[in-house]
Amino acid sequence: PWQWLAAGWKDLWQTPAASISYGLLFVIMGYVMVYLVESRFHYALALTTGFLLAGPFLAMGLYDISRRLQNNEPVHLGHALFAWSRNPLPILLFGLLLGLLMIVWARLSAVLFGVLAGGRELTLDPSTAQLFFSGSGLTFLLIFTLVGALVAAAVFTISVVSIPMLLDRKTDFITAILTSITAVRANPGPMVMWAALIVIFTGIGLISAYLGLAIALPLIGHA
């Protein structure tokens, strides 16, 4: 994984304009999410974790930039934004699958928050903090984290290889998913470390008021 990051760092600074511009789109998306949820804590947490789930699909343009660099092809932001056109139908179907998983996660989140809050809306205020640090709140956080980790692991397993493969070859999305699953099963150690690094770098980007995503996500995407 560290070699992947080194390669990603190299690609990032070979095409800084296209890569960072693409990363800034994630920053804008982050601010749009903040605006939409306002102070509603449960929506904010669900959307943030959903953003992580959609990350592999959203980073498709960065994969294409690295592919073009490897093949000595010209690179600009337009190529990244329309990377899906290389293999549109399988990529669309894979995107729909990820969208379905995000909907499932959103519904699970709503149910879990409903149980914790007793049906009332959670907002960013001291009473919500007290609720989360109560006995039931800590239990909720544990369950929420475990369920979220399972969903995230499933998404990572089916997408870590599949999306780059769909861009590189004219293959169907089922074959790409099965190949991704096989790769994860064959290399559990490096894949777990890579998943952890993705969470760490994305987390740094999120807690830096989303600005860090302009560098963190292109770095991960190129790697």
Predicted regions, residues:
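Hydrophobic alpha-helical membrane segments
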Residues: 1-223
